[in-house]
Amino acid sequence: MKQMKLSVGVSDFEKIRSDGYYYIDKSGWIKGLLKSGAEVTLLTRPRRFGKTLGMSMLANFFDITKDNRALFEGLEIMKDTELCQHWMNQYPVLFLSFKDVDGTSFENALALLQFTLSQFCDVYAYLEDVECTDQERSYIA
């Protein structure tokens, strides 16, 4: 039997599911989120309560640039095949986490924030060349 690893400090859903870490299935939360109909969901939890892991799970579920069915195999969300067909890997996702932005001073924290935003811009730079309709452009203006 394969030894499972503890995911201490690992907040990447794909890494946890692919590399044999223990994972407590919270994928049912996706269905609850979708059924709530809320325009905005605010997650207020203390540090180290899985907020970034939850965001990573959502990104992997919705991201149109990926096919992540294998990551969700055996999880609660896959029991709802209609929901998965309609929502899974069907939408563009921009993922930005500030979990690594901290510092011993304002200047240090600002430098980390600038670095994080710079990396974010590099990852999604290709979007500058995407053709958009006027209506689509109005959403981001």
Go through the PLM ranges and name each one.
Residues 1-141:
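Phosphate-binding site recognition
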